[in-house]
Amino acid sequence: MPAYRSRTTTHGRNMAGARGLWRATGMKDSDFGKPIIAVVNSFTQFVPGHVHLKDLGQLVAREIEAAGGVAKEFNTIAVDDGIAMGHDGMLYSLPSREIIADSVEYMVNAHCADAMVCISNCDKITPGMLMAALRLNIPAVFVSGGPMEAGKVVLHGKKHALDLVDAMVAAADDSVSDEDVKVIERSACPTCGSCSGMFTANSMNCLTEALGLSLPGNGSTLATHADRKRLFVEAGHLVVDLARRYYEQEDERILPRSVASKKAFENAMALDIAMGGSTNTVLHILAAAYEGEVDFTMDDIDRLSRKVPCLSKVAPAKSDVHMEDVHRAGGIMSILGELEKGGLINRDCPTVHSETIGDAIDRWDITRTSSETVRNFFRAAPGGIPTQVAFSQEARWDDLDTDREKGVIRSVEHPFSKDGGLAVLKGNIALDGCIVKTAGVDESILKFSGPARVFESQDASVKAILGNEIKAGDVVVIRYEGPKGGPGMQEMLYPTSYLKSKGLGKACALITDGRFSGGTSGLSIGHVSPEAANGGTIGLVREGDIIDIDIPNRTISLRVDEAELATRRAEQDAKGWQPAEQRKRRVTTALKAYAAFATSADRGAVRDLGDR
């Protein structure tokens, strides 16, 4: 039977000093011997998705102690990708994922915690904590802060549902008046919570449900709704139960690596493809699998993308549908339920809350459950009142969206498309693959060919787009923005948003070794691997070269013969794989440290220390 890890610091005469320090934190004689549970919070006033988390850590802590554990809270950092967007701040976003994972490991191992509750929400925080959980492999439960309500505004007599991306697009569209931009800006992000579309934060919180590490409803229950409080209360009790099951009953089925098995990763990726999740999830799923020593690669994603249909389209793919609408349609368990009916889910994977994910689907899918409690849970609606307070409203929809033919969630017989919402493309420009969010691509441009417009940085591309230098039919190529080349693999939300503002969203393509915001739509192809800084072919593209993109056949090719590419490669080897133009970019020691070990996107942009 495994001993509680915390006994290392709480038992024995030689630990008198450590016990003295524990007592100074409030522990009493009766607490020594109880499981010590780390409450891993990520509160910050910088991020709307985390601004309401300050008191939620202590809410969980009280429930842990009521269940017989000892709760000890600490905080990680949290970067707001939207605020960091469009300037050098974005260089820090992806590297912060590794810092978060490391900081959780440092705190939990240094203090010998027995288990943990991870309170995350936004883009890199959930992935960082997930990586840590799989690295540590101690009992863990995830509970996120929840999605923001969608913005609502009436413009020129017409009602619109809004999100962050609408504000960005409107600001760059010269046809939108200053007054309308102000109205959109003030309405786009009305409450606390992660941005309201199927962007990276919400995508990742949904995937923790599919992995089996969070409670049903975690990905879709609004941050403002009173129903979300139950998830935090249950997480506190659940984690103590999991700790006892592992340390006292030797039940290893509840450990993160047992729950998040290869089959569970397949379930999560099937969900991601079906719901048209952010392309960033591919990076994070690969990185999490790496930490858990799960053999899950781009080839697995490619295999799944060829058989899983797109069952839901949410903003940015469908601008009038947001997470509150997904919840009304039954949330993640109902999407998994539709996949399961099509034989696309592994039912036998264990979860932290149910014997198997199949059992959870049977109870929580609104099209098959007999529980009125479950159905009422998914009636939780937006309150429509701007607020930064969690659990502050109790609005309910009058009815649920159970229309699986034309509703927000479709059946496998009535998909939005037979091809899923994400696809892996390969070809001479991306030998190790690249990713496109097909759910956001108009059918008219699933096949596209055009001349390359080459830029050595995101900034240069933005200048050209806003300067009307990009024309319909062009393929915008942004390189040296990968994990190593950036460094930090910036998101390209501004270039894609500005293309849309210029009326080119369905007339141009954009490819990059960088990545995209979950708010990106259009023919935006990212994660090109190998990246330019690692000698990838994207570094050999020249102005005017024709690039062919064929999403149905999963190919992307540079129309240049092998002999010419070999000549260009020899020339580039001599020059060194770095931008041809000097960039005004301050790369600090911290960023250099990340770049020194960063791998390309096909490996999740994890650090390669040469130990595997």
From Swiss-Prot:
GO CC terms in record: cytosol
* Free-text remark on how the cofactor is bound: Binds 1 [2Fe-2S] cluster per subunit. This cluster acts as a Lewis acid cofactor.
- Enzyme Commission number(s) from the entry: 4.2.1.9
**Chain sites annotated for binding [2Fe-2S] cluster:** 122, 195
Q: In which pathway does it act?
A: Amino-acid biosynthesis; L-isoleucine biosynthesis; L-isoleucine from 2-oxobutanoate: step 3/4; Amino-acid biosynthesis; L-valine biosynthesis; L-valine from pyruvate: step 3/4
Q: Which InterPro entries match?
A: Dihydro-acid_dehy_C (IPR042096), DihydroxyA_deHydtase (IPR004404), DiOHA_6PGluconate_deHydtase_CS (IPR020558), ILV_EDD_C (IPR056740), ILV_EDD_N (IPR000581), IlvD/EDD_N (IPR037237)
NCBIfam families documented for this protein: ilvD, PRK12448.1
Q: Which HAMAP family does this entry report, sorted A to Z?
A: IlvD
**Family designation:** Belongs to the IlvD/Edd family.
Q: What assembly does the database describe for this protein?
A: Homodimer.
The protein's job, in short, is: Functions in the biosynthesis of branched-chain amino acids. Catalyzes the dehydration of (2R,3R)-2,3-dihydroxy-3-methylpentanoate (2,3-dihydroxy-3-methylvalerate) into 2-oxo-3-methylpentanoate (2-oxo-3-methylvalerate) and of (2R)-2,3-dihydroxy-3-methylbutanoate (2,3-dihydroxyisovalerate) into 2-oxo-3-methylbutanoate (2-oxoisovalerate), the penultimate precursor to L-isoleucine and L-valine, respectively.
Q: What is this protein called?
A: Dihydroxy-acid dehydratase
Q: Which organism is it from?
A: Sinorhizobium fredii (strain NBRC 101917 / NGR234)
Task: List the lineage, top down.
Answer: Bacteria, Pseudomonadati, Pseudomonadota, Alphaproteobacteria, Hyphomicrobiales
